[in-house]
Amino acid sequence: MSMQALHALRSLYFISSRIGQNSSSQHMFVTLTAVDILAQYPALAENLLRSIQPNDMCQIPAHPHERCLDLFFLNTAELFTIVLSPEASEELLVTAAMPYLAAGANKHLLEIFEAAHSVVLAVFAIPRNGTIAAKHLPFYIDNLFAVRINPFIPIHAT
């Protein structure tokens, strides 16, 4: 039932993401309750994430609807980072986030860029994912500092 609820919320995400998923207490209640229940069953949580993972995790989709589904995946996946195995975290979460991290300077992808950062940081923060952090941290840092944080502050060559 929890998986079905999250699948239904995914189908409506193109609407709820525009009005703000935090603007409805009922939406938040259903989401967090479903996540809380599924988090008790890590294998089911992983199955859910596999069923909603981006179609092509190596590139950003051209269609806005597909990018919206990617945003739902990243936001939902972040809630399950603590119960996923390191292998699933790297295969599903880090892989899905990487294209958006690399596209950080694109202002049209800012919300997904931030979701990708959040999910990657959540994966890196879990002690058992130390090898994942060691493997992907150089790429993450290079991309983080390649993006101009404030467009009004000029970058000077040294």
Explain the meaning of each model-derived region.
Residues 1-31, 41-81, 93-100, 110-120, ...:
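HEAT-repeat alpha-solenoid elements in large eukaryotic scaffold proteins
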Residues 84-91, 131-133:
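Short, hydrophobic/charged alpha-helical patches characteristic of ARM/HEAT alpha-solenoid repeats
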Residues 92, 96, 120, 135, ...:
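Cys/His-enriched low-complexity segments
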Residues 103:
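Short basic (Lys/Arg) and small-residue
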Residues 125-158:
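Long alpha-helical HEAT/HEAT-like repeat alpha-solenoid scaffolds in very large eukaryotic proteins
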